[in-house]
Swiss-Prot record:
This is Proton-translocating ferredoxin:NAD(+) oxidoreductase complex subunit E. Keywords: Cell membrane, Electron transport, Membrane, NAD, Translocase, Transmembrane, Transmembrane helix, Transport. The keyword Transmembrane helix applies. It comes from Clostridium ljungdahlii (strain ATCC 55383 / DSM 13528 / PETC). The keyword Nucleotidyltransferase does not apply. It is a multi-pass membrane protein. The chain crosses the membrane at residues 11-31, 39-59, 69-89, 93-113, 128-148, 170-190. Its EC number is 7.1.1.-. One of its GO terms (biological process) is electron transport chain.
Length: 213
Protein backbone atom coordinates (compact mmCIF):
# COMPACT_ATOMS: atom_id res chain seq x y z
CA UNK A 1 0.00 0.00 0.00
CA UNK A 2 2.87 2.38 0.81
CA UNK A 3 4.37 1.70 -2.62
CA UNK A 4 1.06 2.60 -4.29
CA UNK A 5 0.92 5.84 -2.31
CA UNK A 6 4.45 6.69 -3.44
CA UNK A 7 3.48 6.03 -7.06
CA UNK A 8 0.42 8.26 -6.69
CA UNK A 9 2.03 11.19 -4.87
CA UNK A 10 5.00 11.57 -7.24
CA UNK A 11 2.64 12.95 -9.88
CA UNK A 12 1.43 15.72 -7.58
CA UNK A 13 4.68 17.66 -7.12
CA UNK A 14 7.91 15.65 -7.56
CA UNK A 15 7.04 14.67 -11.16
CA UNK A 16 4.20 17.09 -11.86
CA UNK A 17 3.35 16.87 -15.59
CA UNK A 18 3.27 20.67 -16.04
CA UNK A 19 5.66 22.13 -13.49
CA UNK A 20 8.38 19.44 -13.60
CA UNK A 21 8.05 17.30 -16.73
CA UNK A 22 6.89 20.29 -18.82
CA UNK A 23 4.49 18.16 -20.88
CA UNK A 24 1.32 19.41 -22.62
CA UNK A 25 2.17 23.08 -22.03
CA UNK A 26 0.18 24.24 -25.08
CA UNK A 27 -3.24 23.16 -23.71
CA UNK A 28 -2.13 24.26 -20.24
CA UNK A 29 -1.72 27.75 -21.66
CA UNK A 30 -4.79 27.76 -23.89
CA UNK A 31 -7.38 26.36 -21.47
CA UNK A 32 -6.49 28.17 -18.24
CA UNK A 33 -7.83 31.67 -18.82
CA UNK A 34 -10.35 30.80 -16.08
CA UNK A 35 -10.23 28.41 -13.14
CA UNK A 36 -13.33 26.53 -14.30
CA UNK A 37 -11.85 25.80 -17.71
CA UNK A 38 -8.56 24.67 -16.22
CA UNK A 39 -10.25 22.43 -13.67
CA UNK A 40 -12.59 20.91 -16.25
CA UNK A 41 -9.78 20.14 -18.68
CA UNK A 42 -7.80 18.65 -15.80
CA UNK A 43 -10.66 16.35 -14.79
CA UNK A 44 -11.04 15.19 -18.40
CA UNK A 45 -7.33 14.38 -18.63
CA UNK A 46 -7.46 12.70 -15.20
CA UNK A 47 -10.21 10.36 -16.41
CA UNK A 48 -8.53 9.64 -19.74
CA UNK A 49 -5.02 9.00 -18.40
CA UNK A 50 -6.27 6.77 -15.56
CA UNK A 51 -8.47 4.67 -17.85
CA UNK A 52 -5.81 4.48 -20.55
CA UNK A 53 -3.09 3.40 -18.11
CA UNK A 54 -5.37 0.64 -16.86
CA UNK A 55 -6.27 -0.58 -20.36
CA UNK A 56 -2.67 -0.47 -21.60
CA UNK A 57 -1.48 -2.45 -18.58
CA UNK A 58 -4.15 -5.10 -19.24
CA UNK A 59 -3.35 -5.53 -22.95
CA UNK A 60 0.43 -5.01 -22.81
CA UNK A 61 1.22 -8.71 -23.19
CA UNK A 62 -1.03 -9.27 -26.22
CA UNK A 63 -0.03 -6.21 -28.28
CA UNK A 64 2.76 -6.53 -30.81
CA UNK A 65 5.52 -4.07 -29.78
CA UNK A 66 5.79 -2.87 -33.39
CA UNK A 67 2.22 -1.52 -33.36
CA UNK A 68 1.96 -0.54 -29.70
CA UNK A 69 1.85 3.24 -30.30
CA UNK A 70 -1.11 3.11 -32.76
CA UNK A 71 -2.89 0.80 -30.33
CA UNK A 72 -2.28 3.19 -27.43
CA UNK A 73 -3.55 6.14 -29.47
CA UNK A 74 -6.66 4.17 -30.47
CA UNK A 75 -7.36 3.43 -26.80
CA UNK A 76 -6.90 7.09 -25.89
CA UNK A 77 -9.13 8.23 -28.78
CA UNK A 78 -11.90 5.87 -27.69
CA UNK A 79 -11.85 7.16 -24.11
CA UNK A 80 -11.68 10.80 -25.26
CA UNK A 81 -14.68 10.24 -27.55
CA UNK A 82 -16.69 9.00 -24.56
CA UNK A 83 -15.67 12.09 -22.57
CA UNK A 84 -16.66 14.38 -25.46
CA UNK A 85 -20.09 12.76 -25.84
CA UNK A 86 -20.76 13.02 -22.09
CA UNK A 87 -19.73 16.69 -22.04
CA UNK A 88 -21.82 17.48 -25.12
CA UNK A 89 -24.84 15.98 -23.37
CA UNK A 90 -24.40 17.33 -19.83
CA UNK A 91 -22.03 20.33 -20.07
CA UNK A 92 -22.40 21.83 -23.56
CA UNK A 93 -21.18 25.29 -22.51
CA UNK A 94 -17.93 23.96 -21.07
CA UNK A 95 -17.55 21.72 -24.12
CA UNK A 96 -17.72 24.77 -26.39
CA UNK A 97 -15.30 26.75 -24.22
CA UNK A 98 -12.68 24.01 -24.28
CA UNK A 99 -13.15 23.72 -28.03
CA UNK A 100 -10.62 21.79 -30.10
CA UNK A 101 -8.32 21.24 -27.12
CA UNK A 102 -10.67 18.59 -25.76
CA UNK A 103 -10.28 16.56 -28.94
CA UNK A 104 -6.52 17.12 -28.85
CA UNK A 105 -6.36 15.25 -25.54
CA UNK A 106 -5.83 12.23 -27.80
CA UNK A 107 -2.29 13.36 -28.58
CA UNK A 108 -1.39 14.92 -25.22
CA UNK A 109 2.22 14.00 -24.52
CA UNK A 110 1.60 13.17 -20.86
CA UNK A 111 -0.99 10.46 -21.65
CA UNK A 112 1.10 8.67 -24.26
CA UNK A 113 4.24 9.08 -22.15
CA UNK A 114 2.73 7.35 -19.12
CA UNK A 115 1.38 4.55 -21.29
CA UNK A 116 4.80 4.00 -22.87
CA UNK A 117 7.06 4.47 -19.85
CA UNK A 118 4.94 3.05 -17.02
CA UNK A 119 1.69 1.27 -17.87
CA UNK A 120 3.25 -0.94 -20.56
CA UNK A 121 5.84 -2.20 -18.05
CA UNK A 122 3.86 -2.54 -14.82
CA UNK A 123 0.83 -4.42 -13.41
CA UNK A 124 -2.70 -3.02 -13.53
CA UNK A 125 -3.01 -1.62 -9.99
CA UNK A 126 0.26 0.37 -9.98
CA UNK A 127 -0.59 1.64 -13.48
CA UNK A 128 -3.98 2.80 -12.24
CA UNK A 129 -2.41 4.74 -9.37
CA UNK A 130 0.24 6.19 -11.67
CA UNK A 131 -2.47 7.51 -13.99
CA UNK A 132 -4.49 8.78 -11.04
CA UNK A 133 -1.51 10.61 -9.56
CA UNK A 134 -0.40 12.16 -12.84
CA UNK A 135 -3.99 13.14 -13.62
CA UNK A 136 -4.43 14.78 -10.21
CA UNK A 137 -1.12 16.60 -10.64
CA UNK A 138 -2.21 17.83 -14.07
CA UNK A 139 -5.58 18.95 -12.70
CA UNK A 140 -3.93 20.69 -9.75
CA UNK A 141 -1.51 22.54 -12.04
CA UNK A 142 -4.20 23.69 -14.49
CA UNK A 143 -6.51 24.79 -11.67
CA UNK A 144 -3.77 26.82 -9.95
CA UNK A 145 -2.78 28.48 -13.23
CA UNK A 146 -6.43 29.19 -14.06
CA UNK A 147 -7.17 30.64 -10.62
CA UNK A 148 -4.21 33.03 -10.70
CA UNK A 149 -4.86 34.14 -14.28
CA UNK A 150 -8.57 34.67 -13.60
CA UNK A 151 -7.91 36.47 -10.31
CA UNK A 152 -5.54 39.06 -11.77
CA UNK A 153 -7.05 39.09 -15.25
CA UNK A 154 -10.66 39.67 -14.26
CA UNK A 155 -10.71 40.01 -10.46
CA UNK A 156 -12.62 36.78 -9.90
CA UNK A 157 -12.07 33.14 -8.93
CA UNK A 158 -14.40 30.48 -10.34
CA UNK A 159 -16.59 33.32 -11.55
CA UNK A 160 -16.95 34.85 -8.06
CA UNK A 161 -15.86 38.51 -7.93
CA UNK A 162 -13.07 39.01 -5.39
CA UNK A 163 -11.72 42.54 -5.80
CA UNK A 164 -14.97 44.36 -6.53
CA UNK A 165 -16.07 46.58 -9.40
CA UNK A 166 -13.31 49.14 -8.79
CA UNK A 167 -10.56 46.64 -9.66
CA UNK A 168 -8.61 47.42 -12.83
CA UNK A 169 -7.79 43.97 -14.29
CA UNK A 170 -4.37 43.11 -15.67
CA UNK A 171 -5.53 41.89 -19.05
CA UNK A 172 -2.12 40.46 -19.88
CA UNK A 173 -2.87 37.64 -17.43
CA UNK A 174 -5.64 36.21 -19.61
CA UNK A 175 -3.50 36.54 -22.74
CA UNK A 176 -0.82 34.02 -23.85
CA UNK A 177 2.17 36.18 -22.75
CA UNK A 178 0.81 36.43 -19.21
CA UNK A 179 0.18 32.70 -19.14
CA UNK A 180 3.75 31.95 -20.23
CA UNK A 181 5.20 34.28 -17.60
CA UNK A 182 3.04 32.78 -14.85
CA UNK A 183 3.89 29.19 -15.80
CA UNK A 184 7.58 30.13 -15.78
CA UNK A 185 7.35 31.51 -12.24
CA UNK A 186 5.39 28.48 -11.02
CA UNK A 187 7.91 26.09 -12.58
CA UNK A 188 10.70 27.95 -10.76
CA UNK A 189 8.83 27.80 -7.43
CA UNK A 190 8.20 24.06 -7.74
CA UNK A 191 11.83 23.46 -8.72
CA UNK A 192 13.08 25.30 -5.64
CA UNK A 193 10.61 23.34 -3.46
CA UNK A 194 11.71 19.99 -4.90
CA UNK A 195 15.38 20.88 -4.42
CA UNK A 196 14.67 21.86 -0.81
CA UNK A 197 12.83 18.58 -0.14
CA UNK A 198 15.63 16.59 -1.76
CA UNK A 199 18.16 18.38 0.45
CA UNK A 200 16.15 17.53 3.58
CA UNK A 201 15.89 13.92 2.44
CA UNK A 202 19.67 13.70 1.94
CA UNK A 203 20.32 15.24 5.37
CA UNK A 204 18.03 12.68 7.03
CA UNK A 205 19.78 9.89 5.14
CA UNK A 206 23.21 11.15 6.23
CA UNK A 207 22.07 11.34 9.86
CA UNK A 208 20.67 7.82 9.65
CA UNK A 209 23.91 6.49 8.20
CA UNK A 210 25.91 8.39 10.82
CA UNK A 211 23.76 6.93 13.58
CA UNK A 212 24.34 3.41 12.30
CA UNK A 213 28.08 4.03 12.18
Amino acid sequence: MKNLWNIFKKGLIAENPIFVLALSLCPALATTSTAVNGFTMGICVLFVITCNNTVVSIIKNVVNPKVRVPVYITCIATIVTVVELVMQAYAPLLYKQLGIYLALVVVFAIILARAETFASKNPVVPSFFDGLGMGCGFTLALTIIGMIRELFGSGAIFGVNVFGASYNPALIMILPPGGFILIGYLVAIVKVYNQHMEKIKMQKLEKANGGEA
